[in-house]
Amino acid sequence: MDPPHNRWAFHHVADLMKTAPISNHGGSVSPLPRRPIHLDDISFTALDGSTTNWNRHLRETYCDAICVIHDGHIVDERYFNGLDEGSLHLLMSVTKSMTAAALGVAIGRGLLSINDLVTTIAPEFAGTSLDGCTVRQLIDMTAGTDFVEDYGLYLNPDSDSVLIEYERQAGYRPLGNSPAIGVLKHFTTYANARPHGTIFDYRSPLTNIVARILEIVNGIPFNDVLSRDIWSTFGMEHRANILVDPLGFPAAEGGMSCSVRDLARFGLAYLNDGVINGQAVLPESWVQDTREGDDDARNCYASYVQNFAGASFEGDNWSMYHNAFWVMERNQQFSGLGIFGQYCWIHRPSRTVIARFSTYPSATPYDLSAETVRGFNAVVQTLVSRPR
């Protein structure tokens, strides 16, 4: 994950690590008609006050691939650093958004409720930090589990921090001298920091428990859940994969790789209230809840910003984290986000989806993240101002 090596590694994950396949099982592919619009020369003001354009912006913000969809058509699609339309790229935490979509499908089928207790479905976590925790608190990261996700620790990859050890157990880093216990067993060693449902605190391992719950209620491995409930029904074009830990459990919080077109298709389902090609692939109520959220999620997020994030936090004016999406403006724009610059950005007023892969030189650089979203907004302004 360390630059500059991540520029190659992020689209060669299966060559470096053990993965499990995700497939649409030979089903039909959802069409993405093309209506190219020349965006190269659109100009906008960069974060430093200078004038830039779309083409320069993409190169200066370490873009690997991007697919812009407007009114259901691809209007711009580009690849850099050896990628092409069939290349897979690591999604990082946009994987969480995929996991949440599979959760929405399972809830829609009546396999569980969002307010079910985790330990009722998965008694293997009884006696851990998840006692009394609901599925809602897991997916919204308001569970009380004690885990510090400090990406500054990446500067010391040989440390014995819980984050680095977690990444060894997940398969992101070599195990070294650590015993192979896997991410689920590793999770059971975490203590509880606070009552559930009181504050948002971003901790990736929580999403793995959601995946385990989905395995239990569906009776199949998590990568097969994704194949059946996301890849097949959404009409994905390219085979995907997901990193697995030493015991074979998928890293549902960040280990998935797919093509940028398929990530755009995923965003289209959320833009279109859960419908792809006239077929409902996600419950409309789940999509609506994702983009609108609720006061509990907003209040938990506000407490996080006030108490932990500080004034420089890039999301200090955002609404909330809900159903594994970052809601930037309630009911208007929301995004799946992954470290090092992965985006599935949905802008409802303009009917736009932007799927983007990047390899930022650090995990969460405020300037590059803010610059990227600034570029998205410049594209939207151009698209909506064009005559129809």
Residue map of PLM features:
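Short, small/polar residue-rich loop motifs at catalytic or cofactor-binding pockets
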Residues: E60-C63, S87, V94, I339-F340
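Active-site-proximal alpha-helical segments within enzyme catalytic domains
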Residues: M141, L206-I213, G255-V275, Q342-S358
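N-terminal leader/targeting segments and the immediately adjacent pre-domain N-terminus
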Residues: M1-D84, L111-L112, I139-D140, G144-D146, ...
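Short, charged, amphipathic alpha-helices and their helix-cap/turn boundaries
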Residues: H73-R78, T119-T120, L155-H196, I220-R239
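Active-site helix/loop module of the DD-peptidase/beta-lactamase fold
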Residues: L90, G108-Y151, T189, P205, ...
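Structured C-terminal helix/loop/strand segments within mature extracytoplasmic catalytic/sensor domains
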Residues: Q333-R388
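Active-site Gly/Thr loop motif
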Residues: E237-N241, R291-V353
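Active-site SXXK
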Residues: G72, L90-N115, L138, V210-L214, ...
